[in-house]
Amino acid sequence: MKSDTIAAIATAPGRGGVGVIRISGSNLLPFAFALTEKTPKPRYASLADFKAADGSTIDTGLLLYFPNPQSFTGEDVLELQGHGGPVVMQMLLARCLDLGARLAEPGEFSRRAFLNGKMDLAQAEAVADLIDAATASAARSAVRSLQGEFSRAIGELNDELINLRMLVEATLDFPEEDIDFLKAANAFGRLERLQLKLAEIFDRAGQGKLLQSGLHVVLAGQPNVGKSSLLNRLAGDDLAIVTPIAGTTRDALRSTIQIEGIPLHIIDTAGLRETDDEVEKIGIERSWKEIERSDVVLLLVDARTGVSESDREILARLPDRLQRITVYNKIDLTHRAAERHDEANGTAISLSAKANQGIELLRQELLRIAGWHQAEDVFIARERHLRALSAAQEHVAAARNVVEGALPALELFAEELRLAQQSLGEITGEFTADDLLGVIFSRFCIGK
């Protein structure tokens, strides 16, 4: 890790009442004196003139000094709070660079905080997630992760894995003892509880990812069932051409909307049917690719005819992991009322895109799937967190299979537990390659 002095503007670009420059390094008292002709008192805001090399005043503002290790980065930290004009901020930053600091790389302050043990990797990522939060729910979830709630949950799982590994090591180290350590400690029951806890955290993390990045929703179904009309209704604009001619939509149309601040990335696809039209065939192939990448599929059917055999074939082909909502459209042409109910294949909603009936029911169902109503329980998570949790689940399941075997192979059991622990360690940064750290922190703001 580089240990030189770094500096960056920590406030957003543009004009503002206050601008902040953050500086981090070792032994910054001489730096502060050269800049202000004052020796700052730790953790006090001091009024100071920020001096240029010729002794003239660049700006007057507040100087704050946080000595190591009680600072954000774990190093000495200075914060210069001046007037928020872009010119004066650049002049003040240039003076800091003249005094020996270099311009911080994106995320370098947070990276130093991580490497100095001030926060783990999940907490460091939560800093960026809090900055990027598009909704109050996402912001609150990011704060919980920043305060260590997600990390503590991972830590509890890690502790249980360590305890189980200790039992295995005891059995391997004392083979002459007539004691079945795994049976005596109820290893099977503990693995079962560990699996349940892993599944719970995976679900909460998955909901948090949706809360932050939004749902990818695909409108699917046979031609001329109202997919484009529903897209236009949800988007509040005429994005798609709507005609009574089947097969009007040949390629995917995309729109991003927000419901209660939750991003919804909606894709209207070509009607799914057998066709000899080569252009339409390409559109249908792309439709299935969009479905495979989505979080939710809205299968639209004509409320007048109900679910057809072709619709059942579409349902059967949908990936099991997908949330699915069967949408009975065109209820304005029937005696059916707008409603939500459960079916064997998932949730069903009766509505009319054309007459704007039942649209709010669909919006609320999408919010439910996105975790909006359970926002206080979710963790803001990233795709890499979900991959690591999934890998840990696989290794714990493999360990359980070993225990259930007629002749348990203790070495294999221990190895699966070790791999599960390593997967969890990737979340908090205990087992993380340097190149991955570079990718993660490069996506941060310069001043973070």
Curated annotation (Swiss-Prot):
Signal peptide range: none
Binding-site positions, Mg(2+): 228, 249
EC number: 3.6.-.-
CC per GO annotation: cytosol
A Gene Ontology BP annotation from the UniProt entry: tRNA wobble uridine modification
GO molecular function: GTP binding; GTPase activity; metal ion binding
Protein name per Swiss-Prot or TrEMBL: tRNA modification GTPase MnmE
Source organism of this protein record: Dechloromonas aromatica (strain RCB)
Gene: mnmE
